Swiss-Prot record:
Keyword Transcription regulation set for record: no
Topology in the lipid bilayer: Multi-pass membrane protein
Subcellular location: Cell inner membrane
Superkingdom classification of source: Bacteria
Species the sequence originates in: Psychromonas ingrahamii (strain DSM 17664 / CCUG 51855 / 37)
GO molecular function: phosphatidylglycerol-prolipoprotein diacylglyceryl transferase activity
Classification via NCBIfam families: lgt (TIGR00544)
Protein's job: Catalyzes the transfer of the diacylglyceryl group from phosphatidylglycerol to the sulfhydryl group of the N-terminal cysteine of a prolipoprotein, the first step in the formation of mature lipoproteins.
EC number assigned by the record: 2.5.1.145
Family: Belongs to the Lgt family.
Name of the featured protein: Phosphatidylglycerol--prolipoprotein diacylglyceryl transferase
Record lineage: Bacteria, Pseudomonadati, Pseudomonadota, Gammaproteobacteria, Alteromonadales
Amino acid sequence: MSVSNFVLPKIDPVAVSIGPVDIHWYGLMYLLGFTFALWMANRQCDKSNGIWTREQASDLLFYGFMGVILGGRIGYVLFYQFPLFLDSPLYLFKIWEGGMSFHGGVLGVTTAIIFYAKKNKRSILSVGDFIVPLLPVGLGAGRIGNFINSELWGRVTDSPFGIIFQNAGPLPRHPSQLYEFALEGVVLFIILILYIRKARPAGSVAGLFLLAYGVFRFIVEFAREPDAHLGLLSLGLSMGQLLSLPMIFAGMAFIAYAYRAKAQAPSQADNVKPPKAKTNKAKKKHG
């Protein structure tokens, strides 16, 4: 063990206690992420020239939050604990035992977007473009919660950047939670904010989010310890990497579709023939 490796102290998982109520660090991170998302959504509404109202944004965020919680839990059970679920279906509802999947959360948010768009007669793509820039800060905050809880740590490393997680043995490991915080939280947020500074084709913002997150997650998974009960799967890839591949392909498809639709719009308009001008011809009289 190198003397330069930092030993992460054991931190009480309870951040704040208010009477009989304990607020855990992970829950606090969720709260911070949701609060920031609401603040940013209100800013986007104020700049939308009436296209979005704050009330509409609040409703969308509520549906999105429920999608994250329900989809994240269902995804974790189906993707990572399916044999346990088959043996004990009630495990799905044991949320207090922990276990959330980001990829399941994406499916949950997608369902929420579709539901909201249909209910309010909005474009699914435009709703997706509105909500995805709000997500990276919450993702980053969640990874900080993982780091504080000493969970989802990385693989063993001899790098001086390795950190010793006391519940993971004496060897230093990649702080993969911090890698994800940096890439999926900070860098992804900056990319999306810079991208939406100009008007973009409908669906391209959501596509960029899917593509960038999928790439970042795929890369970080090489440093993250695979789930012990799953290990590495097909082609030596982790479950997280296998689930990220569809996101990457979907993101590229969304972007290609968005820009193709934008490029075709003017040409379609050019193909519309203008109406013929009416002429007042004198009627021929018959005797």
